[in-house]
Each structure stands twice: as C-alpha cells, then as structure tokens.
Amino acid sequence: MGPAYQRTTVRADLSALPADLAAALRDHAESRQLTITDDLPAWITRSINPPSSSLTGKLFGRRANPADPDSEHQTLVALHPTHLLVVVSGANRGISALSVPLAVATVETPESADGFAVTGFAGQDGRPGSYHLGVGEPHGAECLEAVRAAIMAAKNP
C-alpha cells in the first residue's frame, strides 16, 4: 500500500491566495485580533487523494484514504509573529481555519514521512489538541523547519 496522499508544498504569496482561503485566513485572524500582512511566511500544500491501488478499492471506486471526503484539498500554513495559522479547504469538507499561539505550540516528534503534527491547539476536556500538517516537495521541509524555529523562538525570547 502506497502513501495515502500525493503532496506538493510551495511557498505561498498571501496577496495571491484564492478568495475563499484569503477570506477564511483574514476572518479567523481578525476574530483573534491578529493583523495579517502579505509578507508573512506561508506555504500551501496541495494534497491529492489518489484512487486506491487495492483490488477491492478499485472495484468499489475508493480512494487511498477512504475516510477523506475530497479527492484533493489545500492546506495553508501561515506564520504570524505570535501564532501559527492553518486554513484547510476542500470541495466536500468546506473551509476551516484554526490557530495556536506559538508560545504554547509544540512540534511532535518523530515527524512522519509526509508531514508533522503540531500540538497546542484547543482540544477537548481541557487538554491540548494536535493537528497533522501534511507537506511535500519542494518546500515541505522548509515549512517544517520554519514552524519549528518560530515555536522555539517564541518559547525562548
């Protein structure tokens, strides 16, 4: 069984985002009194959920990750000076945004081959939540290192 997703991560120009992603990012940031400028470091990952390679999957027209409602989705990661912002968009899943203060965030180790998890988001029962950020070439490793460095800098001013 191959990877569940085919991913491509590139640097994102916040002034050139699709309208729905830009609106979700700005609305979420505004609701948290964060100022978004077009020069913030950001990356966008396109995740394609390919058709299943198994015989049963092919027979029933399933995808590699049958739990994902979309054949593809986009994930935007933006580094604000004090927060990590994430916006996810897909045809069936819709669009959602979340953020975590860098000072309470942690990059979980070990990272997976196709991404990394960040802990510190609002979770359930008073415990911190975790979110997996899938990344790919050519700039996935750069995204991970920038997120890790921003978290470390926020914790060690």
Question: Model-found features: residue ranges?
Answer:
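Anionic N-terminal interaction surfaces
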Residues: 1-76
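Low-complexity intrinsically disordered segments
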Residues: 2-34, 94-157
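Phosphoinositide-binding peripheral membrane targeting modules
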Residues: 54-115, 127-128
